Amino acid sequence: MPLTTKPLSLKINAALFDVDGTIIISQPAIAAFWRDFGKDKPYFDAEHVIHISHGWRTYDAIAKFAPDFADEEYVNKLEGEIPEKYGEHSIEVPGAVKLCNALNALPKEKWAVATSGTRDMAKKWFDILKIKRPEYFITANDVKQGKPHPEPYLKGRNGLGFPINEQDPSKSKVVVFEDAPAGIAAGKAAGCKIVGIATTFDLDFLKEKGCDIIVKNHESIRVGEYNAETDEVELIFDDYLYAKDDLLKW
């Protein structure tokens, strides 16, 4: 049975965040990029790529659908230009800036970013939103395998000092904030609980993909106290669309 308790409090060791669709609604900007990219390529179905590739690294999408252009330096340049060329289409996911600022205000680093975007693009999104970047800011340039492979989220949790603890999972409680199937799969494979953000896909889809708790956006989430003894920080969900009942036992 799903939970109905509100507010819901979770004590966690670390939080990992996707960027596109999770912190910033950049999908319209990225869609505009793909349409421009495909204008002189008759074989390239931009609408199909837009539909299927959310959460992928741009390099992986180009390697699959336009392999002649799969050059890392070229792709990095293209993606790095997206915020300047198409940034007017992008806005904060409601509540994201406030939530990130609250995490930044904690006495210890408790959050990281793991995005499929390139470092240049992701840094520019943070600059646009005026969010201080966390120490562990993992991008497409920092991994050999992108989402849905767990490498990005494993790097994030390991960097923060909370690798998977199979003997005692309660000593390494990490949540992933995600909006896309590839990222949800990556987070689950990295041993994390998933906070689904219903910006890109609807409630039923996110439930089907296995999210543990689903929210409309970040406005209903607060950062509570940090406990130095347990090295846990409290996340308080004043409202949510769905939550699994096993969260109470986590």
Swiss-Prot record:
- Phenotype of null mutants: Leads to osmosensitivity.
Catalysed reactions listed for this entry: sn-glycerol 1-phosphate + H2O = glycerol + phosphate; sn-glycerol 3-phosphate + H2O = glycerol + phosphate
Which residues does the record list as Phosphoserine (modified residue)?
A: S90
Enzyme class, UniProt record, top EC level: hydrolase
Q: Which prosthetic group or cofactor does it need? A: Mg(2+)
Entry keyword set: Cytoplasm, Hydrolase, Isopeptide bond, Magnesium, Metal-binding, Nucleus, Phosphoprotein, Ubl conjugation
Write the Enzyme Commission number(s) for this entry. Answer: 3.1.3.21
Residues at the active site: D18, D20
Q: Where is this cross-link: Glycyl lysine isopeptide (Lys-Gly) (interchain with G-Cter in SUMO)?
A: K64
Give the pH-dependence text from the record: Optimum pH is 6.5.
User: Where does it localize?
Assistant: Cytoplasm; Nucleus
A Pfam entry, by short name: Hydrolase
Chain sites annotated for binding Mg(2+): D18, D20, D179
Q: Where is this cross-link: Glycyl lysine isopeptide (Lys-Gly) (interchain with G-Cter in ubiquitin)?
A: K64, K144
Please provide, alphabetically and separated by semicolons, the GO molecular function terms listed in this UniProt record.
Answer: glycerol-1-phosphatase activity; glycerol-3-phosphatase activity; metal ion binding
GO CC terms: cytoplasm; nucleus
Gene Ontology biological process terms in this record: glycerol biosynthetic process; response to osmotic stress
Name the InterPro entries on file.
Answer: HAD-like_sf, HAD-like_SPP, HAD-SF_hydro_IA, HAD_sf, PGP-like_dom2
Q: What turns on this gene?
A: In response to both anaerobic and osmotic stress. Expression seems to be under the control of YIG1.
Please give the subunit comment from the record: Monomer.
Physiological role: Major isoform of glycerol-1-phosphate phosphohydrolase involved in glycerol biosynthesis. Plays a role in osmoadaptation and required for adaptation to anaerobic conditions.
Anything else known: Present with 193000 molecules/cell in log phase SD medium.
Belongs to which family?
Belongs to the HAD-like hydrolase superfamily. DOG/GPP family.
Which named protein is this? Glycerol-1-phosphate phosphohydrolase 1
UniProt organism field: Saccharomyces cerevisiae (strain ATCC 204508 / S288c)
